[in-house]
Amino acid sequence: MGSRLRYGWWPMLLGMFGVVPAVAGVRFEVRAPAGTPPDAVLWISGDVAELGHWNGAGLRLTTSPEGRYVGTVELPPGTAFAFKVTRGDWGTVEKTATGGEIANRPGRASAGEDTIRIEVAAWRDAFEKAPTRTSTITGNVRRHPAFPSRFVDARDVLVWLPPGYDAAPRRRYPVVLMHDGQNVFDGATSFLPGMEWQADETAERLIRAGRIPPCILVAVANSPARREDYTLEVDPRYGGGRSDRYARFLIEELLPFLDRTYRTRTRPEDRTVIGSSLGGLVSLDLGLLHSDVFGRVGSISPAVWWADRAVVTRVTATGHRPVRVWMDIGTAESTPTADGHREWLESAQALRDALVGAGWRVGRDLHYEEIEGAPHNESAWAARFDRVLEWLQAER
């Protein structure tokens, strides 16, 4: 009864008075195939934040008394989305009965509750082992696995050294620190197979062409607590809210280690921090709150919408900082709702306006760009990373 009151009756009652509800419920009912492990947890993974942005998980389903897997997600009315069913990762994604690929399943949130019923024919791991992925790392890379911390979970750190590093023992280099490090250098560890930033190849090409000065790239892997690490505030929908601890890890533990181990420059203008999505959000916060450490910020496709655009309020309260900021957003990063609202794009525009209002100057210490048709994934970010790196590393 509670579910019907929440999703089934109240939208109709509101509609009688001309009120459009802010959210609509989409209920999933999944029938799993024979042979599904009895302790399996099923997930709906899709292309919107509420479904995990294709992270292999997203919305966790629970088992109903009838033995089906059920769950409900709230979305703005009119939101179109695509999804698949998994058991928590892409190695266990749903397949056809003969092991073939299935197309992304479509869905749309309407004003009332919609129920989407799915029959999973088979799971990927019933037919094949996940293919071995070949490493695509290039250049002089040093590995620091399971780097320990008092503040956050241990994680791998990869350090890419520029051409000529070993041959110039007296030279020191600026540092570019990048979040979601699994996606930065290596298609074998990237979130989606083969979709990596190609930061190592791009940096080497720019350095050899004289378009940027030689620099050290540091790829810092995420952890299962990614939302917590990359967000300062708790979002009532998703949790999070511990990036102050992640900042302490970077500033008090990782940077001192890098400075002891490698020939780094340590002025704020010689330290750049770059990330995408929630990584773009935490990059901006690191610049705002620790401008004495990080003087250059790459905020790529930032999740400005997090916690009711809290970062926009923070920019206004904090005011201008001596930090150079690259910020961009793809126009295809959020599916329009029925009324044309696009949360990612409009939130990025609000952040741009707040930065300008606080004193950042477009073309001087702020670059803002909307990339027509660009989606929210590593391939799109790789396609523009050369311009990001060149603008941030340019001497000014």
List each language-model region with its residue ranges:
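Bacterial N-terminal signal peptides
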Residues: 8-19
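Active-site machinery of serine-nucleophile hydrolases
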Residues: 182-252
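Aromatic-rich carbohydrate-binding modules that target alpha-glucans
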Residues: 34-78, 88-110
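A short, amphipathic beta-strand motif
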Residues: 26-32
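Primarily recognizes the serine-hydrolase "nucleophile elbow" in alpha/beta-hydrolase
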Residues: 267-320
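A domain-start/cap signature at the N-terminus of enzymes
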Residues: 102-174
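Conserved acidic catalytic loop of the alpha/beta-hydrolase fold
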Residues: 249-268
